[in-house]
């Protein structure tokens, strides 16, 4: 079977049954034929009890004792013939209150159409989501990271209870992507992720805006560099339509990494949300999933140590979010593999930072689409010898086979640097240890901040007190190491992101004049001299909970150390006097999270 994968830079449409004709502003998809036949498996093996396509759903559709199950399925419209078809669970993270997710219901309709055209039965169901941008800077952000595990739990629950044979998930926002892949890893049934796509940038009076522009406008306002009217103008033009936040923030980081890992179709991570090609991808997903069922090719065949390394290479080369560390560790654990902080450091030492993308750079994901998309970037990384091309993907072919006929990056493009002129010779994600982070921490160092910072601690119990202080006197932060603690997985709870504090610092013009440390996380939109994921967290008695105002803290990226000048004797005295703070919640979903969540260095998983 030959199916079509598409590129935005080409002259011909593929066959009409797969991609109906439409106007895509001269970016017409090229025909890249990728056989879904495995190099080792017969593409059409005889159906037996072990390899029949509906081997899961037949548990409820075939036994006469399951009459109740069959009655319900007839009630929702299935015929007797339909009961013999594979049933595909189509899980959408649709909800109206977020630009990242508001269009996913429409995409799920196209996925269902493709599933049915492939001769299968598609059943759509929804899972929950949290808008990080809406909840950022409030206690609502405590619910963000745990939504990843709720997404995984809910997809696993429905897929298992309903006996679906395969899964196509349609995520949009940051935690959606790892949540859907974690569910696929746990289930280990054929699955494909269809990314909802990136938003286009906003424009007003020759200026370009995105969501981070909106966050940084507050710091610019409190520092007096813009008026309140100018601030509101930024807000009105930062999010001009559907799609995930447009820079190499967490959503686009994870979508690119998952494509590099092989769990989404080529171009999935770079086709913008509102481009007609996104609907074409949705319709193609069913055809590819049918082939995965025939081959019995499952997530644990695709997510391997080598493909996880490919994902890490993508994160480093593109300047991706530090959240990828948490999420890739959690994805690895969902398939029974161990990924450690040291694995990230090894990749960071070997892979240069090449992409001039926001938040630290100039361009956005839509610009990657215009120069050939993620496959062109992956082909470049493969040609440099940075990726393993032998890894299997959801096309039924290896990564190298998928990329063999992909057009190279557009000649003259300036987004992806040549190896001879990287933004940074090694990766921007650095794993730091020391007496302040004995179990590790994650720094995001793009090279623009410098590689060394030392200064007195300015300690805050939570981000809200820090925001009040910088609003009152921004210049008091100059030269300090800002410490925001009590924001870890258990202490936050939920390890909230510190985008509002970092944006306030950057907006106030202090990006090179102070550092920020936290046992919480950073948004993919955060930049500056920032170190997060400090372990152990303050709630668990970590050294970050013992720091006092004025203590000298030194961050040395070259030595990969984060230390304080407080003597061991003094730290021991402080530890003896320390008592664990009371949990901030004692009921509900966050309390369950506190009781189950592992440390940041273990991916904040909740099912171990």
UniProtKB/Swiss-Prot annotation:
Transit peptide stretch: 1-34
Note on how the cofactor is bound: Binds 1 [2Fe-2S] cluster per subunit.
Residues involved in [2Fe-2S] cluster binding: 100, 173, 245
Sites where the protein binds Mg(2+): 132, 174, 497
Alphabetized GO MF terms: 2 iron, 2 sulfur cluster binding; copper ion binding; dihydroxy-acid dehydratase activity; hydro-lyase activity
NCBIfam families hit by this protein: ilvD, PRK00911.1
Protein family: Belongs to the IlvD/Edd family.
Catalytic site: 523
Protein's name in the database: Dihydroxy-acid dehydratase, chloroplastic
Keyword list, A-Z: 2Fe-2S, Acetylation, Amino-acid biosynthesis, Branched-chain amino acid biosynthesis, Chloroplast, Iron, Iron-sulfur, Lyase, Magnesium, Metal-binding, Plastid, Transit peptide
